[in-house]
Amino acid sequence: MAARSCRESKVSILGAGNVGSALAQRLIQGNVADVVLLDIVEGRPQGITLDLLEACGVEGHTCRITGTNDYAQTAGSDVLVVAAGFARQPGMSRDDLLLTNTRIVFEVTQKAVAHSPEATVVVVTNPLDAMSHVAWRASGLVPERVMGMAGVLDAARFETFIAWELGFSVRDIRAMVLGGHGDLMVPLPRYTTISGVPLTQLLSSARIDALIERTRTGGAEIVHLLKRGGAYYAPAAAAARMIETLLGDERRLLPVAAYLSGEYGLRNIHMGVPVILSRHGVERVVELTLETEEKAALYRSAHTIRASLDQIAHLMPANQPPSAV
């Protein structure tokens, strides 16, 4: 199907850190959308966008990119990407960022949605599932329009490790990962295939368990190696895939942190589940048939997210349905 031209689409990235900057680069180089890169630090988004613009002669893209400290310049965005907040440092879990990033995500989402009330919101700030819920509470949008990107990233990591283990092309591998974007995420080998062949027919349970564990700690492994900050190329690639779907004419089945209103027996929570994603946002949550052990793992992950939401409940207006898991 024909792609939309840059002039028909506008994406505003809230936060010009490593993930936000890498995402801006992917979007303009792929001629996906015009981009506004916003940050509170004066000069940072302007400098990054100038650097990206100076690559135009090499890359040949035609998208416009603007660096700004003014939310007014984000007006009329089709997609708002929440990338603001502090990144993980060695020894930190994603949940260590909870209180600080809640305040940041709530504020930037409210300000941006005020200028783009028809936008879809994609969250990449950690802890991802809780921050997706915070952004939804701040936005006032229908839940189908607010989501987090973690599932796409987690599945991509699982696919990469499987490809390395088997020596196959990663293009032939399709993985499914449910649950929170953290140590209790739930990779599903039964729903992971290589050219249609279930992973469970190609690897022993011991090898699969090792790959699952590495997937769960994939982000922490990068944090440890970098010593300062976390992953950004892979998260940016995952967010870009979601944005391309949201701006295009295709419907895709992707795992994202979506709002649940009874699916999988869970309510009033954002968590990684497979959804049908399109330019209309989350069209539908797809409920997979889970075995007892898989369902128990999913509920453990959900309770961890719920505990995080309970910690930050006092930071958000009590204008949404009561929580329940």
From Swiss-Prot:
GO biological process: what's one of them?
Answer: tricarboxylic acid cycle
The entry marks the following residues as binding NAD(+), namely G15, A16, G17, N18, V19, G20, D39, N101, V124, T125, N126
Q: Name the CDD domains for this protein.
A: LDH-like_MDH
User: Which organism is this protein's natural source?
Assistant: Gloeobacter violaceus (strain ATCC 29082 / PCC 7421)
- Record InterPro entries: L-lactate/malate_DH (IPR001557), Lactate/malate_DH_C (IPR022383), Lactate/malate_DH_N (IPR001236), Lactate_DH/Glyco_Ohase_4_C (IPR015955), Malate_DH_type3 (IPR011275), NAD(P)-bd_dom_sf (IPR036291)
Q: List the disulfide bonds.
A: none
Residues given in the record as substrate binding sites? R88, R94, N126, R157
The record's listing under Pfam families reads: Ldh_1_C (PF02866), Ldh_1_N (PF00056)
Which family does the similarity line name?
Answer: Belongs to the LDH/MDH superfamily. MDH type 3 family.
The answer, when asked if Aminoacyl-tRNA synthetase is one of the entry's keywords, is: no
Outline what the protein does.
Catalyzes the reversible oxidation of malate to oxaloacetate.
Annotated active site residues, numbered on this chain, are: H181
Gene Ontology CC annotations of this record: cytoplasm
Question: What is its EC class?
Answer: oxidoreductase
Entry protein name: Malate dehydrogenase
Q: What is its EC number?
A: 1.1.1.37
Query: Record keywords: NAD included?
Result: yes
The protein's GO terms of the molecular function aspect are: L-malate dehydrogenase (NAD+) activity
Arranged from A to Z, the UniProt key words for this protein are:
NAD, Oxidoreductase, Tricarboxylic acid cycle
Q: Which reaction does it catalyse?
A: (S)-malate + NAD(+) = oxaloacetate + NADH + H(+)
